[in-house]
């Protein structure tokens, strides 16, 4: 049983579209069990990997997916303002690139651009993508701006390949959240 170490903390859990999205479900449970109020955000691509219903059932409020289905005219801004921390897990190359470039093309990236809260980015992608110069430059840009990066692990990837790029395990991400 986890201590209530995150009691009263508002954490926005952003899930982007990679196979590792399934790990966000367990991470959500760990955060809620520790007392956090978890507001989930999913990209349209993430919905190909896990269902909104699953994350909504485990989180503290329904999943946010689009800027256009909320009664609040600026839902991403309100969510970003009340966040104590934003966690992006998994963070795909697209989301990392958009965030580094300041492009807010969906609810997730708009929330990242609108927040002043600390942000923890947990990359997950195939080794070739992770090692690509543009991804590494975007990671370096985010680090320079004070974004916390939890490096991906080395291990078995989708398709059976082995290499760097696997999303950190939910317990490891949770431990990092506790430090922030």
Name every feature range the model reports, one short phrase each:
Residues 1-120, 126-180:
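A cross-family phosphate/adenosyl-ligand binding-site feature
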